[in-house]
Amino acid sequence: MHKFRQKYIGDKAFYKRYLMLAIPMIIQNAITNLVSFLDNIMVGQLGTEQMSGVAIVNQLIFVYNLAVFGAVSAASIFGAQYFGKGNHKGHMYSFRFKLYAALLVTAIAMTLFITNGTGLISLYLTDTAGNGATEVALAYGKEYLEIVMIGLIPFAVTQAYATNIKETGQTFVPMVASFAAVGSNAVLDFLLIFGIGPIPKLGVAGAAIATVMSRYIETIIVVLWAHKNRDRNRYLEGAYRGIGMPFDEFKTIFIKGLPLMLNELFWAAGMTTVTQCYSVRGLSVIAGLNIATTITNLFNIVFIQLGACISIVVGQYLGAGELEKAKDADNKMIVFSVFCCSVMAAVMLLVGGFFPQIYNTTDEIKSLATSFIAVSAIIMPFCAFTHSSYFTLRSGGKTLVTFLFDSVFTWVIVVPVAFVLAKYTALGIVAVYFLVQATELIKVVIGYFMVKSDVWLVQMV
């Protein structure tokens, strides 16, 4: 027992450092997801078709978001280690790489949405009821997409700045910026969706406008603070004096980071493909999944952000050449993440059924959403472990391994299982959803052996 405690349980100083880093990130994402939840409810009050149209577009935006995260994360592997080593010029080059990569992804996404937005939305619409509801949902989805695209550029810029700021251990400012953004989003949503006084009722368009405005507010706060506090953000020294970076630097980040960039993109595309597989069971399934996903995201933030902290803390130890400290911290953080998420899963099981009742939709959709939430709660602790394993491998620059662990697993195991069960079996959609989610158990075994092998204990800078 003593050996177990020594290996997997830290002292007060360890948890204080970990939580000081994690709590602002958890709060930031909690507020963001809470406002997304409120936004979802407000759109849901307009009707099932409006809610479904917006939900489908948000699936497409989800792929874009993850592609941007992948682009900036590729350089973040080096950024955390550069900062740990005190190499501010290297940190500056990683920032440039992030900015260029995020804007390139944005340009590609906007081109796709403009030229083929209707086709992409239609992939998720199957009119099993024969009442024409899918055409209405398509119209609302197109309206929402055309406006929300305007907010993609500030989102890309924010990610480049915020990730670099976090790599220096300053998680408070991105949190404040996020508070301002989501707070304004909530207020603007209420005003523009329903219309108050002289402000007209804009419905779905109002939700999109509110999202775009909040994106710009967040960007302005993050960028202005970073440039006004250059002594704390030394990577900005000379960041805009030129546009290039040493070829060797670019090559190193690109080669190491490409699997990570592709991983985020393919994983997100895989998850949306799984949703598309479910959608053949009808619009009610999409609506139920939308409600369940919104609720689940509120609870998932704990393991997502605890995992992200692993990459920062372990990355800094690796950059400083303290490999044993990196391994020790990683063991303790993984156990802590799984424990916290087991508690969150229990809470989610107890209260998850109350949330769908808030929505203005059918009893069938509410029942589906409740069942989906329960399944997600059961699987959550396993997701916490695999997520922590992923960030452990990533902190040591094992991007090809993470690509195999995440994206290849999704496309080789998860997508085929979802496709076959949804399209070629008579199983109920809840049973299908459970079996697809249960594939995470295979990933747990793979993640355990990968982390245990210490293949990730590498100093790259």
PLM regions: where:
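Transmembrane alpha-helix boundary and packing residues in multipass membrane permease domains
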Residues: 25, 29, 41, 58, ...
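Generic alpha-helical transmembrane segments of integral inner-membrane proteins
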Residues: 26, 30, 34, 38, ...
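Short runs within selected transmembrane alpha-helices of multi-pass transporters and secretion channels
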Residues: 72, 76, 147-166, 174-185, ...
